[in-house]
Amino acid sequence: MVQSHPRRGHFPAIRTKRVLDLSRSEVLDAVDADQIAYYRARAPWYDDGYACAGDYDGGAEQNARWLAELAAVERALGTAPIHGDCVELGAGTGYWTERVIERVERLWALDAAPEVLQTARVRLGARATKVHFEVVDLWRWEPRRRWDSAVAFFLLEHVPDEVLPALLATLHDALHPGAPLFVAEGAANDAEPQIETRSIDGRAYDVVERRRSPSEYERVLATAGFSVVSVAARRLMHLLATRE
C-alpha cells in the first residue's frame, strides 16, 4: 500500500520499495519524468526535512542528531576548497546554495524542477545576483562551459546506477583540471538499487533511492576521472574529490 499525504506536503511515513529494470530506456524515462514531477509537487514543503518540521519531526533527541549531522556537513563544506565559478548539481530550494555562494565568485544552480529554483531565488534575495539558475534534467545534461569547482547535496542518491557513470563523466568534462568536487549524501542503507513509490494528494510517484557506500562512490568517481581526497560517513556521508 502506498501512503498518501495531504497538500500540506508531509513526507509519507511508509514508503513502498521495489526494483525496476532501469536498463530498459522506456522504464528509465518514465522514472525520470515521475521523479521530476514529484519534486515539483513537493517544492512548497521540501525544506521541512531540514527544519525537522511536520512529519520530519522525530522528537527532540532524533532532531538534535539530525541537525548535528547537517552541521558536520556544513563544517566540512567550510573547509572544502571550492572557489571561482562553481556549479551546484540539484540545487533544490537553495538550502545549500546560500552556504556555497559565500565561498565562490559565481554559482550556477541547476535543477530539473523550476518550482524549487524559484524558492531558492526568493530565499537568496539580493544574493541571487551571484547565481545563475538553470532548469536542467541532469540525467540528460549537456553543459556548454567549464567550471572551477562543483558541489552536489543529496542528489546522487536519486541517480540510478544506469545513469550515474555518464553524469559523472559529463561533470568531469565540465570542470577544469584540478577542480574540487564536494558531495553530501545519505549514508548507504541498502545494497540494491531501489525505487520508492511516494504519494502526494493520491498520486503515486516513482523516485530513485540509491544510497551508496563510500567505497562505491570512490570506485565510480575514479572511473569518471576523479580522485577522492577525503570521505566521512555516519548518518550522512560527505566527500571531497578532485578532477584529474
Where are these regions (language model features)?
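Class I (Rossmann-like) S-adenosyl-L-methionine-dependent methyltransferase catalytic domain
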Residues: V2-Q3, R7-C86, G92-R145, V159-V163, ...
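A conserved beta-strand element that flanks and buttresses the S-adenosyl-L-methionine
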Residues: V151
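Short catalytic micro-motifs in class I SAM-dependent methyltransferases
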Residues: F154-H158
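A short glycine-rich, Lys/Arg-flanked "PGG" loop and its adjoining helix->strand segment in the class I
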Residues: P165-P177
